[in-house]
Amino acid sequence: MGIFLGLVDSSSPKSSTSCSLMTSCAVEKCLNKDMVRKIVIESSREEVFGNLVEKFDMVCIAAKCGNECSQCKHCHYALEQMSALAQGEKTSGLCPKLETCVFNCLTEDVSKVLSCVATRCNVHCYDGDCPSCKMISRRIFSTICKQHSMTSQPQIKYEGTCPNLFMELADHYVAKKKL
């Protein structure tokens, strides 16, 4: 996942619809369908979550789905945070660990910021530091899960729903990253 930051907000119907449009746009325009299919089919249950979410790219979403993103409060905050961080300005601090980590990646080596964020900062999207980031990611993951019948893939074999699979795999991802 590229830079992913977000705002916690109660979901109004307008926000929910707007976030659905953002999710559809992100899946369609910012993820390579063949790559996603390959990840879903070939990754083990333990690897599928990280292999997918580390491909989620907030920079792409901002560029290719900017209108949809700005209408979804969770995503709009992410755009504001990305802009502030890129300009070296203070953020509102709603996702302190994630924002600090992204800022450190930007200051260490701007040419490697996306890989730095993916390997070092993504965990903060799922560890409770940034609930809105987790919500955006859950929407994208769940859409992919449904499109590719992920729960019935032989290596995944999950009896529940895609959002519940996301929550279970997110917890496992955090536990593994914190080892």
Swiss-Prot record:
Residues spanning the signal sequence: none
* Spans through the membrane: 11-27
Question: Is the keyword Ion transport assigned to this protein?
Answer: no
Subcellular localization, as worded in the UniProt entry:
Membrane
InterPro entries to which the protein is assigned, alphabetical = DUF5332 (IPR035161)
Has UniProt tagged this entry with the keyword Transmembrane? yes
GO CC annotation? membrane
Q: Which domain of life is it from?
A: Eukaryota
Membrane protein topology class: Single-pass membrane protein
Question: Which PANTHER family does the record associate with it?
Answer: PROTEIN DCT-5, PROTEIN DCT-5-RELATED
Please describe what this protein does: Acts downstream of daf-16/foxo to suppress tumors induced by disruption of gld-1. Potentially a direct target of daf-15/foxo.
For this entry, the protein name equals Protein dct-5
